[in-house]
Structure formats: C-alpha cells, structure tokens
Amino acid sequence: MISLLPSSKSWFEIEKNIKINHHEIEPLLQSLIVMAWMVETRDPYTGGHLWRVAQYCRLLAEALGLEKSEVARIALGGFLHDLGKISVPDATLKKPARLSDQEYESIKNHPEVGARIVVGHPLAALVKSAILHHHERPDGAGYPYGLDDGNLSVDSRIVSICDAFDAMTSTRPYRLGMSLDQALKGIKMNLHTQFDGNFGHIFIEMGQSGRLNHILGHTDLGIPLQTCLTCGPTMVVRRNQKTGDHTYCHNCSAEAVIEKSNNKIEIIPTGLKGSSKALQPNVDFDLIGEFVTTSASALIVQ
C-alpha cells in the first residue's frame, strides 16, 4: 500500500493518512480533474482558468522550496478549487454585467459546496483546504469562515494568490483582463490584507522576471487563449486538435476553424453555428492525462 500524506495534520477532522493501491491513484485523480473540467465548461469566459491556476500554484510552491509531493498536492488543489461552482446558476455565471449583492452571495457558497462534493472521495484530504479556504484572507475579511492569518493553510495562501491573479488577467463580460503589470500591482496593494505578504512578494518577483509568461493568456502549454470574434468569450483549442478542426463558442454557438502554422494558432470564424452535438463539452484527456501522471508520481510516498 502507498501512503499519501497531507502536509498539515490539523487542516480538518478527517483521515490523517490515506491508504491507496498503486494502480488506483491515477483513476482517482482523473475522476476529480474531469469533474472540475466539466464544471469549468459551464462558464464560457473561464476556459483554461483551472489549468492556469494549477500551473501558477506549482510554480509558486516550487519557488517557496516545498517538497515535490507538496508542490503536486497544491497544484492539484489549484485545479480543483472551483468545484463548488456547479451550484451557481447559469444566469449568474453568464451575466454580462457586474453581479448584484444577492448574486455575489450565491457565488460565495461555492467553497463549502466544493468541499461537500469531495467528502468521501479517497483523495479528499489532499485538496479540501484549497477548495474550502481559497477565498479566506489574512485580515479575516474572507469567506466562508472569516479565518485570520493564524488559521490559514499554505494551500489557501497559494491558491488565493494564483486564483486572484488569473481572475484579474482574464476578460469578463463586463471588463477586459488586466495586463501582467497591472495585476501584479493589484497583488502588491493587497499584501497582508487579501494576500499573504511573503508568498505574494515571491509571486510578484516571479511575474516581474517573466516566469509566468508561458502560462498567462494560455489554455495549455504552447496554446494561446483564443476568443470568440463574435461575442468575446474563450474558445478552447485542445492540444490534439489540428489545422482544419473546429472549435465553438459556448456563449453564442459560433463555429471557427483552427489554423496552426509556424508555431502559431489562429481561429477563423466560419459564419456557421455549432450543432447541439458539436456544442457538447469536450474533455481534453491529453492535458488531463499528463497532469494526472505528473501528479500521481509526485504524490506517492513509499
């Protein structure tokens, strides 16, 4: 048997050690990642968000000098942090304007919903803190519990920064995404209040040195984020797609053809609309498979 050990034995009152057969870990990881992927497809503006947050988490955890298993565990938490958004109504997710106070309150339920979703899963102990606490703040003004600096896990501190940075640099229906420099300034202005001071400072240094550039504005390594030229949301190009394949806007149903040449990717509108079958969510099993394999090998403690 293999032991998967959470770094902090006091995160929450569940198993301290998880015993899993070697051949079981990858399917268990994949079950969580695919679920998170399907939740993300509900919001046409967030394509690639979970992948980017996971990559930022990995880089920040590495920069902090954490052990390989901890880096993988926190990156996994980054990929799964928004599971609870399955409970958010479509009208709220897709609203082309700022949310009302009531709508924002409904959004604030997603950490607890996400934590309930993973209850009973054999790997829940690895990710529950990232899911439940990624909107908590050092100044105690976060949610859902208003935890203060002395009660925040490493997971929540890292995912909070990475999630906020990606949110700031991503376009929403009511605003364009910030530049890298603007987003780093936003983090700097909120050190010790919204964000951990030490972790945030290191993240800012990473951004200023160009170490985030290959993730920013991408939906996978080497695949720049594409947007619908008709209405604006993200149109995801998967790594196994080639020139001549189609991608679709899940907001207006517009179809576009993919062009790959000279290491560049472009999508060209066809003027057509996707069929109901074409608009079904597609899971990028190549991206997920690579993430799962990397995570599994790092998480295993013999």
Predicted feature locations:
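Histidine- and acidic-residue-rich, metal-dependent catalytic cores
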Residues: 2-301
